């Protein structure tokens, strides 16, 4: 399986502008069908603390866009979005869509970046998720600050069917790129598995 990761220069809190950028990227890239397209954490809005005003229900605008993108490219698509759930605050989610445009599943970020007040605006998730793709490939998503918690990755590896690949979507700041690279490498080495980030 080919993986295409898009480092999007996000237009702040402008979903339509960001959808357009993603469309332009897939037009230029022409991904091979059956591949995995990976978009950043909160790709449609940026890492905004305006979660209450940006949240969407399941099957909202951003999920609909991801489903359409998956169908149009015949690829798996993973992207981050702000989702309304039956909780006090919305969640920061990674959503996985299959090439037919159907939801495979979602993961809610378990470790909010509280130094940036994320925990005040987003509800933390509480379950590690692992999804099976075509050919039996198992994928486990995490989001941004989760990367700093190796125990999450070990728990995923201890599940009945451990993942073959971790995908970490993020809005990681440039000033900590060195940390990002080293942490991705560490999670791969510790778990003897592939990591995309």
Say what each PLM segment does.
Residues 56, 85-160, 173-186, 190:
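Active-site catalytic loop in hydrolytic enzyme cores
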Residues 29-30, 158-164:
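His/acidic metal-ligating clusters that form di-metal
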Residues 15-16, 23-100, 106, 173-193:
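Cys-nucleophile CN-hydrolase/nitrilase-fold catalytic domain and related Cys-dependent amidase chemistry
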